[in-house]
């Protein structure tokens, strides 16, 4: 059956090819499309029913017609050759080198569709990952094996932040085998050059694998890239015992491609035109993060997405939030004031933070200090709102101090630029900023930590 060439292409719709009178095909099966001039394309079976197979074509459909195409079903799924030689390399969305280096040849070939980790085999994430970003490390801590997305908006600094995290991320244990898989989905050529230059100039390319998909590439490429990136990370994590950080940007472009293909299949649309199965599809990507009991490696995910119209209720951030373990939210207001990284800590959350901080991981005062910073910043923003109504001179003396704290917090703690801060520097800076407030306002920190880490003189 696998040697049969089908000449029964009945329809071509967008990136989809419809083949009739087909027998014994399977979901995700790879297909060869052979044109009469000898040119060959590849595709993947999306659906098969009653002898009809719907094939999603990799790459462009230009030149393909119902009369000049023969289809051969290979009987196998998309398998990626993987090797530790991929470290330091740059590939396109299909895992093909674009850095003028040699192709990857390996006896190890893995199905890119992978599978989610069996819940019984999961090991609880518990190790701190230092990103060098105070608003993340200090207040929304990333834990090894966690999936923590960044919610951004058009024109915000998520690309700059992604590149900074990629070059700075590490664990605190010396000698750790740490690596980065960076997948860029639907980006411009300018953005692609920016990422390449950032990785090369910082020296972080040597322990990274980069996959780039351009906006000019076909939509199918965007569907494949995150799965190829995660397959590479899984090999390095579970076969080579590396702790891998996977950064995927922009997942909104992935979901737009999913919507485009769903429309071409004439499926009934869900919310805002996205397919009803988008939650399930996203979970097959996000749930590949984690640690496996008995294995030394791990996969930590930072998917980045731009919220259309800055709308956090859009299906892309909404469904992502249901699957992942928190979110880092970027603020357009802070961006307008030239604060970078423009992280809105009050809208951000790391649900696994408590498992990666404290005396065994960072420092004993970490939890209480983070809570105090949150509470004090919230009061400072309330004081700012009140001052805009009644004037700053009408505020109480304590409210004026909270207002000053909020300004200092944004300008010194949040706004750190390209400077990398250790967790020790981040925690110490937090105590420095709190010293502008009366010591009796420190309701969230343990009293024993105030004289040990605080910056007050004479207890005031």
From Swiss-Prot:
Its main location: membrane. Keywords: ATP synthesis, Cell membrane, Hydrogen ion transport, Ion transport, Membrane, Transport. It comes from the Archaea. CDD domains: ATP-synt_V_A-type_beta_C, ATP-synt_V_A-type_beta_N, V_A-ATPase_B. Gene3D superfamilies: 3.40.50.12240. GO terms for biological process: proton motive force-driven plasma membrane ATP synthesis. Pfam families: ATP-synt_ab, ATP-synt_ab_N, ATP-synt_VA_C. It is found in: Cell membrane. It is a peripheral membrane protein. GO terms for cellular component: plasma membrane. GO terms for molecular function: ATP binding; proton-transporting ATP synthase activity, rotational mechanism. PANTHER family: V-TYPE PROTON ATPASE SUBUNIT B (PTHR43389:SF4). Component of the A-type ATP synthase that produces ATP from ADP in the presence of a proton gradient across the membrane. The B chain is a regulatory subunit. Has multiple subunits with at least A(3), B(3), C, D, E, F, H, I and proteolipid K(x). NCBIfam families: PRK04196.1. Belongs to the ATPase alpha/beta chains family. This is A-type ATP synthase subunit B.
């Amino acid at each position: 059956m696998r040697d049969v060439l089908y000449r029964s292409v009945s329809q071509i719709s967008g990136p989809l090819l419809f083949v009739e009178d087909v027998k014994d095909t399977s979901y995700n099966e790879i297909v060869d499309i052979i044109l009469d001039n000898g040119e060959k394309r590849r595709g993947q079976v999306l659906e098969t029913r009653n002898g009809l197979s719907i094939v999603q074509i990799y790459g462009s459909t230009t030149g393909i017609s119902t009369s000049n195409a023969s289809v051969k079903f290979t009987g196998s799924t998309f398998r990626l050759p993987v090797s530790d030689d991929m470290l330091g390399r740059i590939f396109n969305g299909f895992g093909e080198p674009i850095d003028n280096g040699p192709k990857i040849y390996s006896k190890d070939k893995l199905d890119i569709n992978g599978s989610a980790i069996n819940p019984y085999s999961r090991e609880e994430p518990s190790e701190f990952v230092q990103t060098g970003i105070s608003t993340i490390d200090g207040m929304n801590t990333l834990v090894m094996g966690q999936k923590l997305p960044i919610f951004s908006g058009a024109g915000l600094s998520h690309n700059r932040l992604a590149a900074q995290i990629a070059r700075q991320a590490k664990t605190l244990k010396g000698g750790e085998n740490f690596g980065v898989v960076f997948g860029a989905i639907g980006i411009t050529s300018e953005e692609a050059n920016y990422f390449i230059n950032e990785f090369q100039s910082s020296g972080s390319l040597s322990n990274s694998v980069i996959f780039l998909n351009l906006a000019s590439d076909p939509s199918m490429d965007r569907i494949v890239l995150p799965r190829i990136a995660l397959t590479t990370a899984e090999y390095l994590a579970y076969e080579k015992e590396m702790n891998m950080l996977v950064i995927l940007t922009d997942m909104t472009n992935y979901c737009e491609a999913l919507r485009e293909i769903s429309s071409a299949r004439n499926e009934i649309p869900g919310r805002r035109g996205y397919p009803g199965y988008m939650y399930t599809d996203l979970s097959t990507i996000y749930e590949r993060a984690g640690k496996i009991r008995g294995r030394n490696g791990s996969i930590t995910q930072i998917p980045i997405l731009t919220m259309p119209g800055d709308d956090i209720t859009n299906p892309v951030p909404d469904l992502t939030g249901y699957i992942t373990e928190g979110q880092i939210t970027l603020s357009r207001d802070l961006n307008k004031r030239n604060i970078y990284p423009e992280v809105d800590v009050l809208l951000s959350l790391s649900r696994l933070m408590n498992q990666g901080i404290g005396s065994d991981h960072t420092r004993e005062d970490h939890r209480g200090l983070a809570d105090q910073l949150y509470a004090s910043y919230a009061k400072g923003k309330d004081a700012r709102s009140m001052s805009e109504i009644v004037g700053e001179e009408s505020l109480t003396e304590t409210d004026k101090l909270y207002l000053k704290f909020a300004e200092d917090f944004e300008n010194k703690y949040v706004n750190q630029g390209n400077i990398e801060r250790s967790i020790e520097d981040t925690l110490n800076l937090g105590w420095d900023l709190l010293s502008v407030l009366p010591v009796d306002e420190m309701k969230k920190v343990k009293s024993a930590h105030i004289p040990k880490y605080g910056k007050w003189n004479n207890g005031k």
